[in-house]
Amino acid sequence: MNSSTDPTFSELNASFTNTPDTLFATSVSSDPSHGFGEEDYACGTFNCSPKEFVAFVLGPQTLPLYKAVLITIIFGGIFITGVVGNLLVCIVIIRHSAMHTATNYYLFSLAVSDLLYLLFGLPTEVFLYWHQYPDLFGMPFCKIRAFISEACTYVSVFTIVAFSMERFLAICHPLHLYAMVGFKRAIRIITALWIVSFISAIPFGLLSDIQYLNYPLDHSRIEESAFCSMSPKIVNEIPVFEVSFCIFFVIPMILIILLYGRMGAKIRSRTNQKLGVQQGTNNRETRNSQMRKKTVIRMLAAVVITFFVCWFPFHLQRLIFLYAKNMDNYLDINEALFSIAGFAYYVSCTVNPIVYSVMSRRYRVAFRELLCGKAVGAYYNSGFARDHSSFRESSAYDRVHSVHVRASQHPNKFETDSSSANRVLIKKTYSLPLPKNADSTVLSTTDIVIVLENSHTVCEEPKVENDIWIENEETCI
């Protein structure tokens, strides 16, 4: 949408801004005491027609063709990649029981929220570049779109934070995670964050409505100026944007930085300890370990940077509308920031499947299997299918040996009964060769192996009596 309002309209109680959700404007009312002349309205001394007045305040009804086409192509690419990527994540998690883990439940929640926002928000956003006003969808759609868009935004933020805390516990405090282990806990958390998000978005749905401009000469409402908006009077009286900025950006951003910073330090510390033990043994192994450590740290940094880049312009533009309308070059800054915020806002829905899912080898294999219509290799028959039954404390991305463990409560037999869940297994590590087909980008197992509660899983009896061979596999960090 275009921003073409003269700064002097702030004196007329006429101001507006554009956000990825709504266009804000106030009704214009004239006051003889203001003494505005021709330059103030740029359409004669109150002699402009209502149509000219609307065009002056809200900008052209349709953007220039080249700009509308370019934006449509860019947003169309974002829409296709975002919908396809998130759909693949959802289908893979639903189809494969091995993917029914607490971590993947968070990813599923994130994919669903991104899908909803892309479907409800992006098509309308593109349409507004071709037809900014009058609004053609009516008040019900205006309220529903504002409500769902805001709610899905909150769900995405909460899910990323919850997922980050899950990773933090897995890497830095595995014993605490064991005390809270279980799929039901993850489902309860996800359900709660969806409920809280939708409740938090209710004010945006209730306060959004079809707004109109008033013609300054006779104060009549200009029907052709209809647009979906939240009244600026309400925005000025109720700090909805400020609260949203603090709760759904500042606090999550601080938490994410602290959590991933701590995880990065833990990974670096464990890798350095392992390298100290390996000194003088295998230079190639040392180099590979260092490369894997850098890969993980870069990925952790990518999570923080992605969150900041995608969400900060959106909140910044809202704050500029509230507190900086009188600044120099406000209109140019607002228009540029609106384009950047809209692009980054929707790109986050496309980037999330890549950052949180596709970077995992497990997901890449599952995607190939889904697209090709057949299983790829023997990955599903090995460690892939066992991720839902065991959770291991992880350190750096290092090549590790298979771990030989024995159940402390059942020394003669490992549980084949599905009712034996949530038992700690005492680990004994042996220097066993790594299988040739094992993935090199795996996490090393350290002090504890935890069997997660899964009443529907029955572990097969291993060939070696009383023993379990936990194979190398990826753990999503």
From Swiss-Prot:
Acts as a receptor for the neuropeptides CAP-1 and CAP-2, but not CAP-3. Probably a component of signal transduction pathway that leads to Malpighian tubule fluid secretion in response to these ligands. It is found in: Cell membrane. GO terms for biological process: body fluid secretion; cellular response to desiccation; G protein-coupled receptor signaling pathway; neuropeptide signaling pathway; positive regulation of calcium ion transport. Disulfide bonds join C142-C228. The gene is CapaR. This is Neuropeptides capa receptor. One of its GO terms (molecular function) is neuropeptide receptor activity. SUPFAM superfamilies: Family A G protein-coupled receptor-like.
